[in-house]
Each structure stands twice: as C-alpha cells, then as structure tokens.
Amino acid sequence: MERLWELFQDESVANHGAFVIKKMLSNLALIFAVCFREWTNPLEDFILSAKTAHPLVRFGRQNDGAFNEGTIAQFLESSSPVFIGTFLTFSQIMAEELTKKDVSHTDKSDLHTAVHEKLFPTTESVATKIFTGTNGANTEMWNIWLPCFNSWVSYASKAEFDSTARYNMTPLLRIAVQRMANEPIPWKTDVPERIIDSLVESLDINSTFFVADTKNDLKALIFGPWGRQLLSVTPEVSDQFARLTILLLECDMVQLAMQIANEESSDVFEFLLRLTDFPGMPVVEETISSDFIEFWMQMVDSLTEDTERFKAYLDGDEAKISLFNKKSRALLNNVAHIYWRKIHIPVDEDAIKGYEEEFRVFRRDAGDLFEAIYPIVRNELYHSLSGNVLYAVEQFKNSKVPQGEERAVLNDIEASMYLINAISEDFSEENAPQEIVEDVYRLLNSEVLQLVTGYRVQGSFQHFIYTAIRFVASVSWFYGTEQGLTCLPVILNFLFDNMMDSPTYELISSRAIAEICDNCRLSLQETLPNFKNIVTEMIENVSVDSITRERIINSYSSIIQGVRDPQVQGEYLHRLLELLLKHSTEMLNRLDGLPKEQLDQVKEYLISIISCVSAIGRGMQLPDAPEDVYTDPKELQLVSKYWTEDPLGIHAQILQIVQNFAMGSEQLSDNLKVAEEIEAIFKSGLTESMPGPFVFPPELITQFITAKIATLKTFNTLPLLYDLFGKVIRANHRDMSAESVSRTLEQIWTGFQSQKVDSSDPDIVQALIGMLAAIAGSSPGMLLRDSRLLQAVVVFCIEQLGSKERFVLQSLEQFWTKLIHLRRGNRQDTITVRRLFDETDLGHMLMYNLLKSLLVTQRSNISYFTEILKAVVAKYPMLAKQWMMQSLEKINRERLESGQKAVSEYELFVKRVMLTRGTRTANGLVKDFWLKTNGLVDYDRRL
C-alpha cells in the first residue's frame, strides 16, 4: 500500500502510468486472497488511506472504529474523480483476481464469505452514493463503473456456485436501468449503450440476479414507447437491444408462452415479431433474425414439452385450451413466414459475397426451426410451403412471370423447397400423414422438375437446382407409397440426367439416387432395366467421379439384393461383375505400358473398380436375419441351394477380380486402398448366416491371406491381413479345424519373426496382437494346441508391455484378459492355461513386466495395465500376491540402484489390491499407487 501511495505522488506515473498502478492493485488483490482472514477489507483501507492522505493497512485490527457510515461520504466529497475512479478500478481488479484464483477447498468457502460480507458491501455503498449523488451523470465515472460491475457479476456467480453466499444485485441493477431510461433519445453519450452491453453480459452470466421487479422494469422499457423510439431513432444498437430482449425473456419462457392467448400481451408478441423481421439481409445487414432463431426454438420447446402446465394454467377449460392452441399456431405461422422470406437467396448473389458460410448456417438453423415448428402447426405449414411452389410453377407454366422477375420467383420456389426438405427428413412411410403424401404427389406431378432441368441447361441457378435434387431425396419415404411408386421412374430419370449431363450436380445426384435406392430397394425391382445403360456408362467411362461410380453401383446392387428370385438376382450380378472383370482386366494389362501422365488417372479408376466390388458386397448384405427376409422356409431353402451351387460362377468372378488386383499387378498389389477394399469384400460375407454371393469358405479366405503374405514386397498392408484373419476366426471358428488354423498361425508367426518384417512397427504389432486377441476370445484352443508357438506368443506379448503406443497397449489388454479369463475355452483349454501359470514362470514374468511398465507409462494408459492386473488377481488370487510382492521388491531394488525414486508403500498396495479380488475398486488403488510412485498429485480429487 505504501508503494502504491508513492506512485500516486509521482506525477509521471499518475499521468501516464495506469498500467503500473493496475499491476500494483493486482498484487494487493492477490495478497488479500492469501491473507483474507487477517486483512479483511482492503477497499476500506484504500478509502481511509485517501481520507488521511497516507497509506493505511489495518492488518488484524479491522474493528477499530476508524471506518464508519460517514467515511464513504467524506471520501467522495474530498477525492478527485480520478481517485474515485481508481477505487472502482481496484474493486474491479479485486473481483477479477478472485474469480481467477484457485484456492484450496477448505479456504474457498471462508474466502467467499469474507468477500460477500466485506468487499461487496463496500463496493455497493460507494457505487450507490456516486450514482445517486453529484457524479451520477459523469460519463467517465460510468465508463469505469460498468466494467467493475460486470467483474462483480462474474465473481458473484462463481461464488454462489462454490459457497452458500447469495448476492443481491438489485440496487446496482436498478441504478443502471434508471440511468439508461432517463437518457434522452437520441443519446448524446455512449453510457446507455454500454449499460445495455453490461445488462446483456449480466443476463448471460447469471439471470437469477434479475429479480421480478427488475425484469418488469426492463420489460416496461423494452415493450413500451422507449423501446420503439430507440429502435426507430438509433437502429445501430438494434443487435444488442435484441440480445437484451431475448435473454430477458428466456429467463421465463414458460411464463411468456402462457401469455400467448392473453389479449393484453398481444403487443408484446407483435413487438417480438417486428424485431425478428428486422429490415435487412440476414447475417450481412442484420443479425437479429439469426439471434431470434434460438429464442423461437425455446418457445417451441416450451409449447411442446410443458402442455400439462398450460392446461393447469388454463384450468383445464377446453375452450381456453383451444384458443391457446389456435393462437400458438398463428404466432408460429407468422414466425415461419418471416423466416421463409429471410432465407431467400438474394437475386443478386453478390449481396452475400464473403458471408456465404454464415448465410448457409443461418438457413440451416432456420430449417431446424421449421422442423421444430411442424409438430405444433402440423400440415398447414407443409401445405403452405408446397402451395408456394405449385403457385410459382403454375405462373411459369402459363407465362405469367414478368420479364426480369424469373430469378426472384425461382428463389421463392427454392426457399419453399429448402424448408420442405427440413420438415420431410423426419417422415417415414409409416408416419407420414396422408395430406402430406398428397402434397408431395402434387409437387412431383407439377412441372417443377422440368423447370429445374430447363434452368440447369442455362448453366446458372445452382441453389435452386441443388435444393430441388435434395428435395426428391428428402421424400424417399414417399416412393414406398402407392402414389409414390408411380413417380419413381420419372424421379430416377431426372436424377440420372442431372448426374450424367452436368458435372456440377454429379455428386449430389448420385447421393440422392443412393438414398432412394437404399430406402426403396423392394419398390425398385421393375426399374432395374433402367439402370443398365447408366451402370455400363459408370464402369466404362474412366472420367466419371469415383464416388459417383461407387454410389451408383452400390445403389444398383442394393436393388438387386431385393430381388426374390435367386436366379434373376444371379443373372443381374453376373452381368455386373462380368463388366467389372472385363474392364479391370483390360486396364490392369495396359497399366505398365501407360505414359506417366495417364498412369495416375488409370490407377484411380482401377481403385474405384475394386471399390465398386466392395460396394456390391455391402449392397448385397441381407438387411435382416435370413428368416425375417425369407419368411417362407421353402424360399429360404431355395435361395441357400442356389448360392451353394452358384451355377453362374459368381464366386469365381469375385475371386478372379481379387486375384488380379492382389497378385496380378506390380503397381497395385501392395496398394493400401486396394488392400482395404479387398478386406471389405471378404468381410461383407463374414457376418451372413446363409450362403450368398459374397459368402466364401473360411479356408479359402485363409489361403488367400497366407498366399498374399508370401508375395508381399512391402508390409504396409500386413496389418489388414492380420485383421482379416482375426475376423475370419471370430466369425467362423466353429466351422474351422483347429489343425488348419494352427498351421496358418504358425505360417503367420514365422513370417512375422523373419527379418523381412519390421517387428518394431507399431501398426504391425498392434494388428498381430489384435488377431491373437480375437483367437483367444473366440476359440482359444486354436492358439493353445501348439505349445511351442504359444510359448513364443506369450513371451512376445509380455515384452510388448513396455510399448509406448496406446493402441498396442489396448490390444495387449484384450489379449491378456481374454487369455486369463478364457470365457470361450473348454475344460482342456482351462487346464492348459492354468498349468502355464502354475508350473512355469509365466505368472511372475507377466507380473514383473506389467508392474514395471505400469510405473513408467503415461497416466492415460494406466487403465490398460489395471485391467490385466485385475484379471490375474481375480483368476489366480493365491499366486498373484506372491508374484506382486516379488516383482515390486525387484523393481524397487532396481530403481534405487539406478538412482530413481523408491516405490513407496508397495506392501500396503499389494494388500489393498488383493482385497479387491479383481473388482473395479482396484482402479483407484492402481491410479493412486502410480501417482504416489511418480511424485504426482491427483488435483481432481483435491478439488
């Protein structure tokens, strides 16, 4: 404090050293946070120091009578505005430092109590006397006070959360509201605007500080002549005015919603609608409409979720409830109409240049609002939007659109369809009301799609065309209805035309086709011939986008999957795969002779072709269990028989394509993307429980894996092969002979141990251990039957406990817990594993390496080691204690010899862990042991 007063005496500091003074005030605040029991009120001492003109610190003697009711008045009368402002700055800094300060749990409550009882009352008294006295209109004083007030709001909110202290902000808020209300409009100073900012911030931080009287005073201002005059004379404050209105009303949204049917409140809702419809382009010229979306969403939530409260409020009177619902719908229809106009793409699209992303988000949020409004307004909203489209289309059809107005009318259609899309996403064939089905039918039978095609040819109007394409996909549920079936051929032709004739709309059209085909596969059987030319073009045309090609092939195959007759299904698949095999073979044969400039394009095409085969596999997967798809047992038997016999050799076609890519091409055989797609091809049939086009014998897939491993030139695809073998075992272990699996495992292990494979590559190691974990978890006997291999595997998995790679440790946890618990093992498997732990040094080796690695691992990896430890303790309780004690004694000795910190209290740790018997209780014990051994503190627990 003495140093602070010295700075006040230094003219150069007083005039230009605000930063130095603030730093000193900050230091005093930090001292108070530590010594608040001895130095209970630094703010009083500041005032006393100013009054006596020399520094005073009453450390430990606060109740000496030096500060009384008249002291503040004397301070304000005798001090300069600069000095009074410094006091407010000191109070602000005090609140800010206390907000940031992290104190111990025991001190926290006492500190908050001291501040609530001492510092805040002093600040409140000074502020009240300043702004009800001669300095009440002082602009500079207000500009200092408002940041101080905001800081106290932030601190008080934190203090109320952390303690029993409860703050009464009403007197200070009332002063601010009165100052704002009394300022003549137009404002001559920035104080009222800053007060609005301060009120917005306070409401945002903690609206409970605004009691009913304060909120009513503010509402009277906002919805009265003051608010209307302010918006008409000072539109530049409209954004913050709207924020103030929104935050104030959101505090009592249910109460506000209850007033919808009250005539006295109609002006309030009219005012809110006018604010929502504030003039200007959203985002670019005004943000009020954007801010109000969340407000109206909350209103809708209240109307949807609080219906019982509204009924009680209306005394269960059916007439009142009916009127309330009617007025609610009318209000939301008005809101919807405002946002329908607001989301329009401007005729001059340059108007949103630089704001494209923000405007897109605004439209998306408006769409979400319409989706929320629909359950209240119901079909009236959908009918209104579809009516807008039909009317505009009719205007075009009858040439009634004035010249030069075409773009504006198209934007009307686009806005309506955009919002129809938002609502339509939630419907399904089962829940769509008949009136909505009729509306969609009328839309699709109007000339709207012809209009889209016509303007697409002109090469402009992208928003309109995108939204129209999105529309036909958003109503995919409609095509399953009786009326929708009649529209399907037209819709698909429309999408195919857009996809094939315009690269701009290729991707969105292919996505729409994929959505429709996926949702309507059973309704699209008769359209399969229509796909023939499209599919041929997709496969033969190298320049087609890869994503488009894969989507269309997947869509086509999903329709084929829905064909009930397996012979017809097989013929379609055979022709499709024949086309893929023919063109991929031709391209693969030409690959080596291509010039460099063509090579990349052809490689991309070929990768897309193998991806198409994978896409067919996904499309051909049964959507449900076989008995649910083929409810007639005879039909199920017929389909199974067909795919078992495979008269058209479809399995051979698929395998030939795989063979060509995996082993027939120098340039693609080790390509990672190719390997991923081949794995996906085999995986697509692994989960099927009946014969099918992509269901292969597990031995065949295993043969492919071993042959592929033997021909690898690089090993970046090796993890995928390990992963595939693990999945084959998991899916088919009941049908595979232990001998053949053991033989394959031996080949894989020998290959891994060879000098060619980088056994330190974490991706390869993780995949190998993951494969072993899959075997241990599904059919452990296949791993246990070869004792020599088993010995090598467990030694390797013990060594890998020292890995720093998180995903390697994750796989190790799975391997060891599955091997120890042996939930899928038979009696012989259990005997084999128990003998390993009982009769060899495996248990001790595992425990030593486990604990040693645990103590040096990262905190985020502790859980992996803990799970293994819990498994050992649960399964081998008698031996685990001995292994743990011996291991920790050895680890402790090694640490001391190397100058490291000792392992503290490990005997107690062992006792406690053993008491848990491998349950979740051990988790906290292991973490605490790790923290203590590493000299760390669990700050989460301290707090």
Task: Kindly give the residue locations of the regions a language model identified.
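Karyopherin-beta/Importin-beta family HEAT-repeat alpha-solenoid scaffold
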Residues: 1-943
